[in-house]
């Protein structure tokens, strides 16, 4: 069994902020597995970054996908000296020393991240699994790499007020799991009363 460092062993007030190479090195050195988030730049390079937008972590405007990788190098993570890392560089650094949980950040129906990142992961020699809030990403893996352990992320979207509509009702209640057939579900632990979460337990 492994304990995992969420976005690396990080502290956003230090020189090892979330999803940084420094935070990942600290996790490896401490013997923790690593959970990280990947998405594509404008020039289709997988980078490790949680939010779709730059504002919270980098103080910048726009989204990751609005910038090329080189353009993103102008930004620093949480006022540290760390910059947004390439997924490929993280894989090379970890080098199978600890297991990875790779969250695929997929907006709407754009699945272009999946084949690009999957090519890198198939060449990777370490232990890993994938997960995503977007069931289309989980389904892509069911179809194209069914032997890989895949997870469906979910949350009480409607309770948090920021999200409304049929789509978030479907996601909150895991209504597409019968199609995507995830190997595990990771649900926001702050909402134990949600029926779909209870059923999964």
What role is predicted for each listed range?
Residues 1-201:
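Phosphate-group recognition and catalysis centered on beta-loop-alpha active-site segments
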């Amino acid at each position: 069994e492994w304990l995992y460092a969420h976005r690396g062993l990080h502290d956003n007030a230090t020189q090892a902020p979330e999803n940084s190479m420094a935070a990942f090195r600290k996790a490896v050195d401490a013997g923790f597995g690593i959970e990280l988030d990947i998405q594509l730049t404008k020039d289709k390079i997988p980078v490790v970054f949680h939010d779709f937008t730059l504002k919270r972590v980098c103080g910048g405007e726009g989204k990751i996908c609005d910038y090329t990788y080189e353009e993103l190098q102008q930004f620093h993570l949480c006022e540290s000296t760390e910059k947004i890392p390439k997924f490929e560089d993280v894989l090379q650094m970890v080098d199978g020393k600890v297991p990875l949980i790779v969250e695929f950040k997929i907006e709407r129906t754009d699945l272009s991240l999946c084949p690009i990142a999957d090519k890198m992961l198939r060449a990777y020699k370490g232990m890993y699994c994938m997960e995503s809030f977007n069931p289309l990403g989980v389904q892509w893996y069911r179809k194209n790499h069914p032997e890989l352990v895949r997870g469906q992320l979910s949350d009480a979207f409607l309770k948090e007020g920021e999200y409304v509509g049929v789509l978030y009702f479907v996601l909150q209640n895991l209504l597409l799991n019968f199609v995507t057939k995830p190997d595990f579900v990771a649900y926001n632990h702050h909402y134990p009363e949600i029926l779909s979460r209870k059923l999964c337990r």
